[in-house]
């Protein structure tokens, strides 16, 4: 009986750990979504700025810098999207483990 209680306690601790990790991943995903939006706005801003800059203003170097910045922001957006996909996959895996653990715990309780 003591082994069952000890095992149940360990399972509860593991379940709590997974639940907290799942919530942390959800917060990370939302943070990444915010960063994606921010960087997409920056890309739009740079596109708009680039429309106003003309060659007769003799700032070709500024255009080069703006294009470089735009590429950097686009890369960041891509990186955050990839990270979101990874986080979503981790959350799915944790949800499945939690579901399995909950079912195993219910079976264990029925045996008692």
UniProtKB/Swiss-Prot annotation:
Coiled coil spans: 70-111
Entry keyword set: Coiled coil, Cytoplasm
InterPro entries (UniProt xref): DUF496
Residues spanning the membrane: none
Superkingdom of source: Bacteria
Disulfide bonds: none
A GO cellular component annotation in the UniProt record: cytosol
Localisation: Cytoplasm
Pfam families with a match to the protein in the record: DUF496
Family label: Belongs to the pole-localizer TmaR family.
Function: Pole-localizer protein involved in the regulation of several cellular processes.
Name this polypeptide is given: Pole-localizer protein TmaR
Species the sequence originates in: Pasteurella multocida (strain Pm70)
Gene name of the record: tmaR
């Amino acid at each position: 009986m003591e082994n069952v209680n000890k095992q149940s306690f360990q399972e509860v601790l593991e379940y709590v750990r997974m639940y907290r990790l799942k919530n942390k991943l959800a917060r990370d995903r939302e943070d990444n979504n915010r960063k994606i939006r921010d960087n997409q706005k920056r890309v739009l801003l740079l596109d708009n700025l680039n429309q106003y800059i003309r060659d007769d203003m003799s700032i070709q170097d500024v255009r080069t810098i703006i294009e470089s910045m735009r590429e950097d922001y686009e890369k960041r957006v891509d990186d955050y999207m990839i990270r979101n996909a990874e986080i979503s996959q981790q959350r799915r895996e944790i949800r499945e483990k939690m579901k399995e653990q909950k079912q195993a715990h219910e079976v264990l309780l029925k045996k008692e």
